[in-house]
Each structure stands twice: as C-alpha cells, then as structure tokens.
A protein has these predicted regions:
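RNA-interacting cores
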Residues: 1-224
Length: 224
C-alpha cells in the first residue's frame, strides 16, 4: 500500500422489506382488455403458414360473446382479475406527482398477486364485483378502419391490494397515500386518465376503502 493512502469501507444495510395491504373501491367503471388467446393463435398460425398465409381466405364471422370472454383475465380458480403490474405501474407513475424518482420507485414497491391468468400466467389481483357487462364501443384502428371493440366492464368494483415495499424508502402511510393518488389521478386498465396514449375515458379510477364495503360487492353476486 502506498504511503498516505487510505481505505474506505462501504456498508450495505440488509434489505428492509415490509408488507401491507389496502382495500380499494372503484370511483368509475373498470374496463379490462386482454389480448385474446384466439387472436394470438391466429397470428401464430399465420406465421407458421409463411408465404401461404397470403392466400385469400373467407373472413370468419365475429362471435361477440367469444370476443367478450376472450378479453377477460380469468384465474385458475375462475375469478376475474386485473393484472397486478397495472397497480404497480400506476403507483410508480404517481411518484412523478410528489417529486419522488420513478426509477427508485420501480425498485421499492411491488404488488402481490392473488392468482395467475389461467392461459398466459399474468399475475392478477382479484376483482370484487358483479359479473361484468359486455361493453361494445366504436373505435378507429391504426389503419383508419372503424371497428367495434368488445370488452368486459364493471360498473362497480373493488380489490384488496397486498403490497411489498422498501422500508428505507417509504413508510406504510406513504404507500397507502401513493395508492390513493394512483387511484384518483392515474387509474388502471382501459381509458384511465393517466394513459400515455390518450386523455382517457374517465374509467379505472379508485379510492381507498374498507374490507366490509368491498366484500359487500362480492355478496351482491360478484367473484366467488
């Protein structure tokens, strides 16, 4: 070691990961839109067919009920859910409202899954509410062609968010307040106000609630 050279010791504290949960209730309708398995299979079949896929084929009739059910995230246990990353992303986006670095938030807050999508394995948060209605909306595709988009919509809904967070970055109260901001100012799923592609449709917003109020939605005929 050279004369007068000093050494510096770096101390890394162990992870201070904590857990919590909060019940939420929708303040606006929720619209979910899963990329259907049928659409994925059609794309795969076309790619497997190669050049022969360019031959003209008869256009298959559109089964609106099938499209509606294909747009739902249904777990292995049969209940409808919202992708858990949707809530995490909303919380991370809400950090920009309070001056907290989103890059730090990405490593500091996580939403636990209640289950997984039965066909694609997406982590899901269970929806409490009545069975969704079939929403049919006129949309314009990227090609400029008009189409009818068929999606499930819950007019009343709720959920229980189980979260993990870095206790050196947030307190439990911080996370709950962040979830509240995410619900009122960012939203989740289709037509949310915090969408990066549009100004939203006034859907997907929520507020902090309590277990009794959210479970009451289930008793009215929602997820089992």
């Amino acid at each position: 070691m050279k004369a007068n050279q000093t050494t510096e010791t770096i101390h890394i504290a162990p992870p201070n990961i904590k857990n919590g949960k909060v019940w939420i209730k929708g303040t606006a309708p929720l619209v979910v839109h899963k990329f259907s398995d049928k659409a994925k299979n059609m794309i795969r079949a076309k790619q497997e067919a190669g050049s022969t896929a360019n031959t003209k084929k008869k256009r298959e009739a559109k089964d609106f009920t099938e499209v509606f059910n294909g747009a739902r995230h249904i777990s292995f246990d049969g209940w409808d859910g919202i992708p858990a990353p949707a809530f995490r992303n909303a919380c991370i986006r809400a950090c920009s409202l309070v001056g907290f670095k989103m890059t730090m938030a990405k490593m500091s807050i996580f939403i636990e899954a209640d289950g997984f999508d039965a066909t694609e394995g997406t982590p899901l948060v269970k929806i409490y509410g009545k069975e969704p209605r079939q929403l049919e909306s006129m949309v314009r595709l990227a090609t400029g062609v008009c189409d009818i988009s068929v999606r499930p919509q819950w007019l009343e809904w709720g959920a229980c968010l189980r979260f993990r967070y870095d206790g050196d970055q947030f307190t439990a109260e911080d996370v709950i307040n962040l979830v509240h901001r995410a619900g009122l100012q960012v939203g989740v799923c289709e037509g949310r106000p915090g969408s990066t592609n549009s100004n939203g449709c006034g859907w997907g917003t929520f507020e902090i609630s309590d277990e009794a109020s959210v479970r009451a939605l289930e008793k009215e005929g929602g997820a089992k």
